[in-house]
Swiss-Prot record:
Record-stated family: Belongs to the class-II aminoacyl-tRNA synthetase family. O-phosphoseryl-tRNA(Cys) synthetase subfamily.
Primary role: Catalyzes the attachment of O-phosphoserine (Sep) to tRNA(Cys).
UniProt subunit comment: Homotetramer. Interacts with SepCysS.
Species assigned in the record: Methanoculleus marisnigri (strain ATCC 35101 / DSM 1498 / JR1)
Top-level enzyme category: ligase
Taxonomic superkingdom: Archaea
Name the record gives this protein: O-phosphoserine--tRNA(Cys) ligase
Keyword hit for Protein biosynthesis: yes
Catalyses which reaction(s): tRNA(Cys) + O-phospho-L-serine + ATP = O-phospho-L-seryl-tRNA(Cys) + AMP + diphosphate
A GO biological-process term: translation
Amino acid sequence: MRFDVEEFKKRAREDFEHAWHEGPSVLTPAGVSGRYPRLRYTRATPHPIFEIVQRLRETYLAMGFDEAMNPLIVEESDIYRQFGPEAMAVLDRVFYLGGLPRPNVGIARKQLDEIEAILGRAVSPGTEEKLRETLHGYKKGTIDGDELTHELAAVLEADDAAVVHILDAVFPEFRELAPESSRNTLRSHMTSGWFLTLSSLWEKRHLPIRLFSVDRCFRREQEEGPTRLMAYHSASCVVAGEDVTLEEGKAISEALLSAFGFTEFRFQPDEKRSKYYMPETQTEVYARHPVLGWVEVATFGIYSPSALAEYGIGVPVMNLGLGVERLAMIAYQSNDIRQLTHPQFFPQEISDREVAGAVHLREEPRTVAGKRMAEAIRATAAEHATAPGPCAFTAWKGEIAGREVEVIVEEPESNTKLCGPACANEVFVHDGSVLGVPDIEKWATVRQEGVSTGITYLDAVSSLAAARIEEAARCGEEAHVQVKMSKLPSDVNLRIEEYAMRHITDHNKKVDLRGPVFLTVRSVIPEQPTR
């Protein structure tokens, strides 16, 4: 908090050592919620696939490749041009685009009667004609589907809800529509787009042309599995020029993949022979990873002149492609691409550190004075914890809400101590469980291997007492706070965030914050408030 600079200058000149020791008095008490591990600076987490995409983009750009965006929608005829007789087998793996046809809706007397019944009024001849024109415009495509309801509402002078009812009840043609496929497909591999792009560029740029694209592709797999997705990312590049050879693929593989920690490379002919590549050029790239050893990471080859000729491309083209998800699996050492791509649909793992940060106090004082009161209660109770009852100790005196308040920690009964044995218990998270444990040999493993929340039972109860006293003082009342046996987190003023609690129960872990606390705190307010 702010402090008086001149005052501290004066104190330092008069008694430097005393002024130095008073330094902490200018600090605002953090309170339990302001302590680590609840207080932390966090970095937002990028999605692993998009992180690899970004690294690939940066690497390609650093290698001198220009970025391109290839067409995502490819006509069926282009597949035949690229694959030749193999096209039929390839088309079995592509998604065709379809849509709902626009019905030819007629308006007879029967439909008009039903519309009038819904509207509760007659439809004039002029409105009838406009209604026909609107439906005809929708059929012809001059009115979009998402505008139809609004346009009909304007014609009929009715609200959208009535129009939706009319469309559903009067025109069953809309409900009976079935999708119809077109001859357009979603790109199943980046090569389909490269032919289209290069056919427009190869005579308009200086050769060699070096382009890359990291983008979505779609493949109609029979089912998705640990290594296969229907929607995936391809990181692909092309080099087009008069003197392009297969050696380009080897050099690019090393330059690109060395950025991901691969150190050695091996190239071998691919047993699969795609017809858009020249014979004997389709090559698999294996790279040595320092942790995983030799893994297959990419494929390259030189496009067949027969396929290039279909697009009027008159120079050799080398193409290299790799699956981004495959590279991400290697980088993150994952064994299921589905979990890496869509982690939200799989069980979430939460570390002990994260669970510890999810343990909070239910009630805390709000003011600086209240926080100092909580610290004083804790310190006084800890200092006199073993004092035999009956006993009472003044923990704090100060002003709250314009009133002088005295806070007393006490034990009114005989044959007991000021604090129960569990007051010194500290809350740890160990192997997913939240445990309140004392500092004894039995719990040494938990205290050494677990993650501390930085909260003891005494911390939590002291904050509870300070919060209640603070609130009572605002109302001009005294407070009496007593905590006896703890069985639940709420008994010692603790709460665990819902997501962490769900993780604990889902994994059959436990929350054990039991123990005899037995601490009593009360406040005393003089009759007259301070002025």
